[in-house]
Amino acid sequence: MSMSCKINWLMVLVIIALSNLESSLGRLVFEGSAGLMNGFTTLTNTKKHAYGQAFNDEPFPFKNSVNGNMTSFSFTFFFAIVPEHIDKGSHGIAFVISPTRGIPGASADQYLGIFNDTNDGNSSNHIIAVELDIHKDDEFGDIDDNHVGININGMRSIVSAPAGYYDQNGQFKNLSLISGNLLRVTILYSQEEKQLNVTLSPAEEANVPKWPLLSLNKDLSPYLSKNMYIGFTASTGSVGAIHYMWMWYVFTFIIVPKLDFDIPTFPPYPKAESQVKLIVLVTFLTLALFVALAASALIVFFYKRHKKLLEVLEEWEVECGPHRFSYKELFNATNGFKQLLGEGGFGPVFKGTLSGSNAKIAVKRVSHDSSQGMRELLAEISTIGRLRHPNLVRLLGYCRYKEELYLVYDFLPNGSLDKYLYGTSDQKQLSWSQRFKIIKDVASALSYLHHGWIHVVIHRDIKPANVLIDDKMNASLGDFGLAKVYDQGYDPQTSRVAGTFGYMAPEIMRTGRPTMGTDVYAFGMFMLEVSCDRKLFEPRAESEEAILTNWAINCWENGDIVEAATERIRQDNDKGQLELVLKLGVLCSHEAEEVRPDMATVVKILNGVSELPDNLLDIVRSEKLENWYERYSKVIDPVTTEESIGNLAITEPILPSGRPRLFL
């Protein structure tokens, strides 16, 4: 039984709430730079290369006093970091579980007031910490200068992720740890699941995010004693920062109750006297020069206004495949970018009509990493622009204007598939034949990306929202505007997990490495969702029906997998087709990557060229993970490709290890 299911019946045992630390100082013991500043509890002040500690004066029971078993628990605390410089932090803050009240011999700077250079990494430390790190230390393998990590006995994080949270729609939102805003951290540990989850979110978010930022599957009982002290540490280096602690809550159960409070505003970092004088001087000089510069500014303004729409085509852009549109063309086509269709995975999407041809287009304004050069970015887009398949949304061209990038696609009038699945009651319901056709269209597109091109293309985000429907109810797979090409033999690793929860294969969370198998997993979930007419997760449904994959397998084991679909779908379908799609969906979404078929095999099964094995349920249940489709390949033709890509024909056998990989 999952942690989310158990939450519904867990009983409240104990609540220890230190609400508003500044009024509960008697329960805290301060060390180092920790104390009071501006009426708030702080772990550091303006002193450089210093650390502060604040620990509860009484230990917290982590193990049952009768049988010594580890107990489940949750912690919630609120903090804010106000840096000396708005764009540069110091070192960071950490939540700590320690065998002692306070940590003797701790060092500042990169050690966060927890460890030092001699005891870092010692198994005898028995310290568990959640770090909110604002400085990238290569010696500890830090991923960046704005991340959250789980550490055991040392400063090298076991798992870490860039600071952010998943909103109620499952979209990832970045957060800055040095924004000066109040942030909430929730730490939940289930002893039965042996799982530690960490979430980070803005304080104004009413609810804790449904999906954790970090998840560590590990039994913590060997690292914790019966009674341990809980507290916080922080440190500064050559750059100063004030680390504020505001509220914290401890629960011996894994429910996190809704908290109601007024969000405080923290004062800015105190400026040195020399800085104040400098600000006054700069202000005076600015005002003195303003009049003299005004005339020049007006001249420059009118000159730039005249040349506003002038765009220069650089020599290297001639090599790019897609057509380059002028900014003026797109500005006029979209009526000044006022016809907003929605927000895509990388930015807003606008509807437009090209003058002359009256062709309908969709224009996506791409938000991209500023560290990535425009030349490199356009090279990647030119690669995507050469994809040609009837079930892929076609990239018509691009526009580069003022360091912004606009991608131009065919406009599909019926919008995305999710509107048909979960739209209003007035929305036309899809028939079974339409659903089956959509599933086959998406399968064909994905098979082309995996097997039909000169590169292996990994989509990474298969879901109904990324499937668009044309006026004839044909489906096209979209939202693959940004990509990176990796040479043969390169083992891709990513510090940011891409995709949508529910459609992400289990191995993605462990390795962060997308593969064709992770795409197949997402497609399996997609098949179940479309064919059953149910969401992947129904929290209000009966417990056995709450998770769609589990419900489908239960129905299958009970003799009729078709019962997993809604009554409307069961009454309007070819039962044989529905049974085939459901079984194939369960197989594709198997937790073990080795069990899943490839997309070429999936297409053959959907088209009736090949059949599923008779003992498929045994394969799904089997703990011995083998490539069933390799054994089954005696009745399946070898995968070869003969696809037309513009004027290029590919007739050689396609092998995943023999081509570069393209990650979308």
From Swiss-Prot:
Residue ranges of the region described as Legume-lectin like: 28-250
InterPro entries hit by this protein: ConA-like_dom_sf (IPR013320), Kinase-like_dom_sf (IPR011009), L-type_Lectin-RKs (IPR050528), Legume_lectin_dom (IPR001220), Prot_kinase_dom (IPR000719), Ser/Thr_kinase_AS (IPR008271)
First and last residue of the signal peptide: 1-26
Membrane topology: Single-pass type I membrane protein
Glycosites: 69, 116, 122, 174, 197
Entry EC number(s): 2.7.11.1
UniProt subcellular location: Cell membrane
Residue intervals passing through the bilayer: 279-299
EC primary class: transferase
Superkingdom in the source lineage: Eukaryota
Keywords associated with the record: ATP-binding, Cell membrane, Glycoprotein, Kinase, Lectin, Membrane, Nucleotide-binding, Receptor, Serine/threonine-protein kinase, Signal, Transferase, Transmembrane, Transmembrane helix
Binding site residues for ATP: 341-349, 364
Topology Extracellular: residue spans: 27-278
Active site per database record: 461
A Pfam match: Pkinase
Membrane-side (Cytoplasmic) residue stretches: 300-664
Name assigned to this protein: Probable L-type lectin-domain containing receptor kinase V.3
Species in which this protein is naturally found: Arabidopsis thaliana (Mouse-ear cress)
Source taxonomy: Eukaryota, Viridiplantae, Streptophyta, Embryophyta, Tracheophyta
